[in-house]
Amino acid sequence: MPKILEFDEHARRALERGVDALANAVKVTLGPKGRYVVLDKKWGAPTITNDGVTVAREVELDDPFENLGAQLTKEVATKTNDIAGDGTTTATVLAQAMVHEGLRAVTAGANPMGLKRGMDAAAEAVGDALKEAAREVESREDMASVATISSRDSVIGDLLAEAFDKVGKDGVITVEESNTMGTELEFTEGMQFDKGYISQYFVTDPERMEAVLEDPYILLHQGKISAVAELLPLLEKVIQSGKPLFILAEDVEGEALSTLVVNKIRGTFNAVAVKSPAFGDRRKAMMQDIATLTGGQVVAPEVGLKLDQVGLEVLGQARRVVVTKDDTTIVDGAGDPKDVEGRVNQIKAEVENTDSDWDREKLQERLAKLAGGVCVIKVGAATEVELKEKKHRIEDAVSATRAAIEEGIVAGGGSALVHAVSVLSDDLGLTGDEALGVRVVRKAADEPLRWIAENGGVNGYVVTTKVRELGLGNGFNAATEEYGDLVAQGVLDPVKVTRSALVNATSIAGMLLTTETLVVDKPEEEEPAAAGHGHGHGHGH
């Protein structure tokens, strides 16, 4: 396929136009008084959002060269979103400012490679300064403040602080759409997985259609259980102990299942059978998680255990197990806390090492189930458009709060960057083009604060000058249009979000500035429509 090429200054200017198109669409959403962007959808109602990455993902430009610039800037937003889950608009604004400043320097004769080296060094120095300025998230109020700033809603902030309070920093918090108007929290303690009872005859509470076992023994079996002869020796020991039995196996069928059901109906003893969750290797891993949590062993031939030869020593225990038709919850497993902690650390190491997003998500789920519990935030709103917008904000706030717990918090509202670049005052001791690169980053660092102010209807240049004169931790609160101690006012940003935004923006801006050639496919010329012959008059014989 033929290509079109663009070189040097023309190439960089085309990229800049693309960056501007995307960044101008995104930056209006920045700050507490940021505006909304309406996105047209092929079907259904349009989406209204102020989430930077959602806007960025929708932008495709007509000019292929400009589109390259827009797509590269989109990468800034998505990468920041992947790492920190928030701060996508800040990253886009920083990238645009660095591209503008950098191109001005290149046009004036600076060497792009020298510029890039200076920019990278500056980003690293500012990142370190941000980390040093950070303080740990100590209280529930801190979490509520971070979530409130991210979601622009104090009710959501309080709700998320409560959620993190309950599940801890490793716990899973999921956001779901609700049919009601309000937003509420549902908490599941213990380990929950989505498999229910094999037969509804196991139900102990007919009103709620639940099977509840208090202080049961837990049998974990890797294969299928169909022959009752395999199960009988163990069953007899369990009946003698007087405790109920919870069975988790690939399947329980045939006479083994009917024996359990008949004994349950007669009241001889209480048991519930459930199919094990997931498939393949993940099933084995989850069974091992449950074994660690309950202090039992997985009965499997590969570890030399056969069902008809084992006793009570392989069974796990828990305070209670609740089984519905769709899911099972194990509360207070009797496993050794040290073993559970070891298992948690092992899964954390796997999370670090995996390249697959899907694997990472599934590992995080396993981690949460072992480490704390699961919180579901049910989001409600008057219309579907509002519901989607609210859900976006809450998802961002969850990510921001998690990032804050991880690396700590700094003063928000763009002021942390303005103060952190003071470490660049001597150009890091660099000279020439590298020093110019440092200045590019120093100038760009004002832009997020400037746009937060501009979107609030205040002159951004006046605000950035004033904030620079104030001490560390002080800044401009765009919601109240006052200057002051932002930390005390609860205007906080997670360091991880601000740092990721800066590092990713510097990376992409550096790539754009050092670009010399663009290569795109030549658009195909549309062929004129063929004349309408070809109406065959064939007759079937």
Curated annotation (Swiss-Prot):
E.C. code: 5.6.1.7
Family from the record: Belongs to the chaperonin (HSP60) family.
Species this protein is from: Nocardioides sp. (strain ATCC BAA-499 / JS614)
Protein name per Swiss-Prot or TrEMBL: Chaperonin GroEL 1
Subunit structure: Forms a cylinder of 14 subunits composed of two heptameric rings stacked back-to-back. Interacts with the co-chaperonin GroES.
HAMAP family, per database record: CH60
Protein residues bound to ATP: T29, L30, G31, P32, D86, G87, T88, T89, T90, G413, N477, A478, A479, D493
SUPFAM superfamilies: GroEL apical domain-like, GroEL equatorial domain-like, GroEL-intermediate domain like
GO cellular component: cytoplasm
Top-level taxon: Bacteria
Any one GO MF annotation of this record: unfolded protein binding
